[in-house]
């Protein structure tokens, strides 16, 4: 069983989410991860965002995974995530700032090991999740999400992963479509 905790402070040079130029934010974050075994992992995170216009947002997130089935080449994990957040005030601003928001999602992750030879391995991963999200003033809507990735563990301790993700989130009552492509290369670890 492993417990990890972290306290972080960040002052990104970039913009606040969806904010016009000139809006910046500072982030304070407390993070706790509990890994009772290789088959279960839970994370709890509390964040506070302080925007340059004086607004403040508090957020609490819980996420976890639990192994449901395994054989030598396929792993199936159940996924769960929940979050709740609130803004200090409900004034009109130029970025996403609901007075109250919450979300719950559940899903499944299927990982197939294509091949493995000593420290080299190729895996592919599919994640499917869905759940309701709530925003004060706009009610609840269901949000689906789908992601597919390739993960390469290279014998020298480095790792390469890439994939595509799709979701249909709702902001201020308007449904959006998000499509993401990502590429990640790391030294000294597995993806």
What are these regions (language model features)?
Residues 1-191:
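Gram-negative and organellar
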């Amino acid at each position: 069983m492993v417990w990890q905790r972290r306290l972080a402070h960040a002052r990104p040079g970039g913009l606040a989410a969806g904010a016009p130029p000139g809006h910046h934010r500072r982030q304070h974050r407390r993070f706790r991860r509990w890994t009772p075994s290789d088959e279960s992992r839970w994370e709890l995170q509390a964040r506070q965002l302080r925007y340059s216009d004086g607004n403040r947002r508090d957020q609490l997130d819980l996420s976890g995974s639990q192994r449901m089935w395994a054989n030598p080449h396929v792993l199936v994990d159940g996924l769960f995530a929940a979050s709740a957040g609130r803004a200090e005030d409900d004034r009109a601003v130029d970025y996403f700032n609901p007075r109250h928001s919450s979300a719950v999602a559940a899903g499944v992750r299927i990982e197939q090991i294509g091949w493995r030879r000593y420290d080299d391995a190729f895996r592919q991963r599919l994640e499917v999740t869905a759940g309701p999200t709530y925003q004060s003033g706009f009610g609840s809507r269901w949000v689906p999400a789908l992601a597919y990735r390739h993960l390469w563990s290279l014998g020298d301790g480095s790792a390469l992963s890439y994939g595509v993700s799709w979701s249909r989130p709702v902001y201020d009552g308007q449904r959006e479509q998000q499509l993401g492509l990502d590429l990640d290369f790391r030294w000294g670890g597995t993806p």
